[in-house]
Amino acid sequence: MEFGLSWVFLVALLRGVQCQVQLVESGGGVVQPGRSLRLSCAASGFTFSSYAMHWVRQAPGKGLEWVAVISYDGSNKYYADSVKGRFTISRDNSKNTLYLQMNSLRAEDTAVYYCAR
């Protein structure tokens, strides 16, 4: 019984640590093809300026697709071929926020977008 209580406590402790990292996306919407949208991702619970950050997306009925990555200081950016020249990833380390500017949107860009560390 003593072992069981210790195990439950350990699980609760680990879950608490995981919950300290928060990434909250905003800015999505429904737009016509050819229009623009800007997504934001507010980060907390870790030193944002120390990490490269990614955007990934999941289209309806499909798997996850990597979209873009930006280095910790914003000096390097890489994009999936499907969005290159249309999407721009950026960050503001003073605001702990990641951005994705999406221009010339297409029907195939329809997806749930996630930021990831």
UniProtKB/Swiss-Prot annotation:
Coiled coil, from the record: none
Compartments in which it is found: Secreted; Cell membrane
Chain positions covered by the region annotation Framework-3: 78-115
UniProt KW Repressor keyword: no
Keyword entries, A-Z: Adaptive immunity, Cell membrane, Disulfide bond, Immunity, Immunoglobulin, Immunoglobulin domain, Membrane, Pyrrolidone carboxylic acid, Secreted, Signal
Main location: secreted
Annotated S-S bridges: 41-115
Location of region: Framework-2: 53-69
Modified positions (Pyrrolidone carboxylic acid) in chain numbering: 20
Domain (Ig-like): residue spans on this chain: 20-117
Function of the protein: V region of the variable domain of immunoglobulin heavy chains that participates in the antigen recognition. Immunoglobulins, also known as antibodies, are membrane-bound or secreted glycoproteins produced by B lymphocytes. In the recognition phase of humoral immunity, the membrane-bound immunoglobulins serve as receptors which, upon binding of a specific antigen, trigger the clonal expansion and differentiation of B lymphocytes into immunoglobulins-secreting plasma cells.
Quaternary organization: Immunoglobulins are composed of two identical heavy chains and two identical light chains; disulfide-linked.
Protein name: Immunoglobulin heavy variable 3-30-3
Organism: Homo sapiens
